[in-house]
Amino acid sequence: MLTLDTLNVMLAVSEEGLIEEMIIALLASPQLAVFFEKFPRLKAAITDDVPRWREALRSRLKDARVPPELTEEVMCYQQSQLLSTPQFIVQLPQILDLLHRLNSPWAEQARQLVDANSAITSALHTLFLQRWRLSLIVQATTLNQQLLEEEREQLLSEVQERMTLSGQLEPILADNNTAAGRLWDMSAGQLKRGDYQLIVKYGEFLNEQPELKRLAEQLGRSREAKSIPRNDAQMETFRTMVREPATVPEQVDGLQQSDDILRLLPPELATLGITELEYEFYRRLVEKQLLTYRLHGESWREKVIERPVVHKDYDEQPRGPFIVCVDTSGSMGGFNEQCAKAFCLALMRIALAENRRCYIMLFSTEIVRYELSGPQGIEQAIRFLSQQFRGGTDLASCFRAIMERLQSREWFDADAVVISDFIAQRLPDDVTSKVKELQRVHQHRFHAVAMSAHGKPGIMRIFDHIWRFDTGMRSRLLRRWRR
């Protein structure tokens, strides 16, 4: 069967002009004009999509099939062009019957033209074919316009859906034109309104926690210099006090007086429930005289190392991708979970604005991965925000997954971020030594976002930077009062 592209070539119909007219009409539609005025940053992103629209329309016209009736009429026209005038006179009755049978727009005019002339001359033969060709061009142009109109309606519907999605998420995720462009690209997925409302919800929560948002921005902007030791540098002795585990970490070896609520003896806690002794409990708490378990597990010793006296130069580290590990244990539920998800959303915003990648790993008993900056970033973000934190804590697996990711070339300059309350078992020695090697040799940076004031110091010492956001009730009330 004849294709529309072939018909356009045969009749010299300019499809490019029709496509350009359709795109201009689409961009000038009232819906897009209002949207561009409201979200000017997304205008450039949508305009960048025009070449893709143009190519899709060309492909649609190229693959479209011509109706059988029009195909048969075109074939008859081509055969008629090869006839001499005497042959044309002989074939004319069959041609007129064919045009009538096919309900051709040219059929009635053709019969009137023949009836108006008593003799078929060479000039009439040429005029007949010229007018027939014009009729075919009109039919081909109409067919092109019908197909383009169908595509325009479909394209306008798609653009309106993406505009609705992008317009909702632009205040949350788009910080500049780069972010707006990437957000528009990610809006091409099949998403429903109820899906992306989850991102809007956490975006509103993030706006209610300006300290958390500011913390994410500080982490995103943090940049250190790489110091490169000289090969011939003189060495000097450097002494420092280090804390290290002694015997069994956190082993109970007696009782002591302190204000450590987490290690409180049950009899002391019982006095809190007695009205007459409640003030006495608070007095002893303030004076650190409550009976608590004494733990044995850490000691200090002097460590002597040698290091170069001078350094050759400093290379500023580029801002690489984010590898974010989120603790999904039960202790991270509730408000901690909301803060962790909102913090990741803030990092996603930074990654989109600075053309970086943002890779999320959820760790508990197993590791689940999401890439929030890829083509399916919005869908991945929705799946991540839909997760519930009810697992256990396996920090060792988290660090092993990070180190495995850092070995690949595309993630070599990534920043590793661990979001947790850091109430967990101590890390194995092999994991600790590997992390220190990455920090020392490859200058990788490990960030900790601590959601609790009770995180274990033995775990947190491994990080280059510790960003604290205490989610305890007292800290939350203080932050609200300061606002």
From Swiss-Prot:
<dbReference type="InterPro" id="IPR036465">
    <property type="entry name" value="vWFA_dom_sf"/>
</dbReference>
<dbReference type="InterPro" id="IPR002035">
    <property type="entry name" value="VWF_A"/>
</dbReference>
<dbReference type="InterPro" id="IPR008912">
    <property type="entry name" value="Uncharacterised_CoxE"/>
</dbReference>
<keyword id="KW-0963">Cytoplasm</keyword>
<comment type="function">
    <text>Component of the RavA-ViaA chaperone complex, which may act on the membrane to optimize the function of some of the respiratory chains. ViaA stimulates the ATPase activity of RavA.</text>
</comment>
<comment type="similarity">
    <text>Belongs to the ViaA family.</text>
</comment>
<protein>
    <recommendedName>
        <fullName>Regulatory protein ViaA</fullName>
    </recommendedName>
</protein>
<dbReference type="InterPro" id="IPR023481">
    <property type="entry name" value="Uncharacterised_ViaA"/>
</dbReference>
<dbReference type="GO" id="GO:0005829">
    <property type="term" value="C:cytosol"/>
</dbReference>
<keyword id="KW-0143">Chaperone</keyword>
<comment type="subunit">
    <text>Homodimer. Interacts with RavA.</text>
</comment>
<dbReference type="Pfam" id="PF05762">
    <property type="entry name" value="VWA_CoxE"/>
</dbReference>
